[in-house]
Amino acid sequence: MLKHNESHSKDFKSLNEWLYYLETIHTTEIDLGLSRISQVAKRLSIDFSFARVITVAGTNGKGTTCAFLENALLGEPAPSDLSIDEEECALTQSVAVYSSPHIEHFNERLRINKCNVDDQSLIKAFKEIEIARADISLSYYEYTTLAAFLVLMAVKPEVIILEVGLGGRLDATNIIDADVAVVTTVDIDHQAFLGNDRETIGFEKAGIMRGNQHIIIGDPNAPQSVLNYANKVNDEQEYNNQAAAYKKIKVRNRDFFNILPTSSHSQCSSNWQWLYKEFDSEGHEIEFCLNDLNNTKIPQDNVVTALMVLKQLGIKLTSKKVNALINQTQVAGRTELFKAPVFNKSALDDHEIITYKLNSDVMLDVGHNPHAGRYLAAKLTQFKSQNQYQRIIAVVGMLADKDIANTLLPFQGIIDDWHVAPLSVLRTASSEKMVTQLSSFTKSINCFDNITQAFKMA
């Protein structure tokens, strides 16, 4: 029973009041570590033993992988445990996803059966945390993560998908021992917190892995640090035979593959294939293949990884089912396409809903590192090669601590005009800084006071 602490009792009536308060109570915006949140979680008796938990880490692709899994698992039979030999049984009643950050509304961070959490559930959770934490200082992210966990404990979904916020090893979500650990991609980002090279960053992301847990490594060229971490936690467990141990770790381009129609291994005339290999207890190779899969609007790498997760969960996969999921899955702000003539979206400066009448389509993408830049540039190149668009204008704002030069360089020769502006946050890069980075490969740059103005003039 928690004792009421008057000095930490808050009675804010609205969610916005709580969120404003949370921004003021911790000195550091990003403060990695599990010590503080673990203490408070223990006081709150955080326990997810009622659910199967999937934790997803990675530089890019986390949100899309989570969304694909969410769509796939809703209404699917849920195995009583996560053995791939387990027969499917009762229907899954609910699937919850915790992710960050949000695009328009804070409630987007936690959705249950694809519905965003309501204000009152969050307010109730915030009050409980405020009493429980006493004199322990929590960052905004730690506090809101605990709130999501309290809501999940009240709702008790059968499947919980956790998207790591930053890194993995020291991220607040890592207080939970998941049943499945997924690492999507490893690339350079958040160097001040995670390190300056893929090996160091990979180690941080691999920190979500546990022994006796299904581990899915989705990076097609995973750093050795990720593989070493997976093998280390796996070696610490006792298995009946090596085949049982091998089944726990699945690595892209070793155990599962995407095969393009141009490949000599492809057996279909168009689209692509997903191939999975494993060995039985006698060492015989077993193959499973999904043929004629649709080309994806979302990154194919994420679909490839998510399918391996589903296979490990014992979900029956068919090409028809997977194609339906590919067509269904879209994540806000990830190559999100709004068709002319009307585009409704929150203005970035004042958060009011504004209706823009457009003469052109608009693609919204929140990519902010070189890996994401390369993917988006490839998408736009594809559009141009198919003569879908004659002219592409980029409206760009970035944070000052991002690798602006290498994120924007892949767009050389693709973007016709650049509209740059500062974001409405303290960490924003100035227009001048972005111009300096862009001027090495383009002269068609226009500066604006804010993103809304830059967008209106595009």
How should these model regions be labeled?
Residues M1-T28:
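Charged, amphipathic alpha-helical linker segments immediately N-terminal to NTP-binding catalytic cores
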